[in-house]
């Protein structure tokens, strides 16, 4: 999870949104800031010990810019917690001359922080990163209830998702 340019500076973010929430890459210390608990608001997510989190973080960090996890955090808050997150996985293809596709996954905003535009900011930044990485498209799967939300993020409905779970 190598560094890319972060979202606009805190001052710019405050001017744009009226809050000091920053969008940045996941850090190894985010376990203590409730990252795993936030993911459990999206889907079943067993609690990880600090060492399990560190091992998973190291594995994902080794993928570099092909696997980017962003988080939203308000460093001005008395108790800094992760308020939102989203992930971008970049897939290399033989199609389109070895093109790349960005997959947006695991987007969730803490229930207490919803309605503040944090998910939109995370998703838009993930799309920017995909574009910077040379992806020819960005795709995601969502429930029917979230179609309108992702349409606000610029996505259009295409196709049908099918899955096999193990």
Curated annotation (Swiss-Prot):
The annotated pathway is: Nucleotide-sugar biosynthesis; UDP-N-acetyl-alpha-D-glucosamine biosynthesis; N-acetyl-alpha-D-glucosamine 1-phosphate from alpha-D-glucosamine 6-phosphate (route I): step 1/2
Gene Ontology molecular function terms on file: glucosamine 6-phosphate N-acetyltransferase activity
Assembly notes: Homodimer.
Source domain of life: Eukaryota
Give the UniProt subcellular location, in the record's own words: Endoplasmic reticulum membrane
Per UniProt, the keywords (alphabetical) are: Acyltransferase, Endoplasmic reticulum, Membrane, Transferase
Listed Pfam families: Acetyltransf_1
What's the stated role of this polypeptide? Acetyltransferase involved in UDP-N-acetylglucosamine (UDP-GlcNAc) biosynthesis. UDP-GlcNAc is an essential metabolite that serves as an initial sugar donor of N-glycan synthesis and thus plays an important role in protein and lipid glycosylation.
Q: Which family does it belong to?
A: Belongs to the acetyltransferase family. GNA1 subfamily.
List of residues binding substrate: 43, 93-96, 105-107, 136-137
Q: What is the protein's given name? A: Probable glucosamine 6-phosphate N-acetyltransferase 2
GO BP terms, alphabetized: UDP-N-acetylglucosamine biosynthetic process
């Amino acid at each position: 999870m190598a560094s890319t340019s972060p979202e606009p500076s805190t001052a710019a973010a405050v001017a744009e949104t009226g809050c000091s929430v920053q969008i940045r890459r996941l850090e190894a210390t985010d376990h203590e800031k409730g990252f795993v608990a936030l993911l459990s608001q999206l889907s079943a997510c067993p609690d990880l010990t600090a060492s399990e989190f560190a091992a998973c973080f190291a594995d994902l960090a080794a993928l570099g810019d092909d696997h980017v996890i962003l988080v939203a955090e308000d460093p001005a808050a008395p108790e800094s917690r992760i308020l939102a997150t989203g992930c971008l996985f970049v897939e290399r293809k033989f199609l389109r001359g070895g093109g790349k596709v960005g997959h947006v996954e695991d987007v969730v905003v803490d229930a207490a922080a919803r309605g503040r535009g944090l998910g939109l900011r995370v998703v838009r930044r993930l799309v920017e990163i995909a574009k910077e990485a040379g992806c020819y498209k960005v795709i995601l799967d969502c429930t029917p209830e979230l179609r309108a939300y992702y349409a606000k993020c610029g996505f259009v409905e295409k196709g049908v998702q099918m899955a096999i779970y193990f």
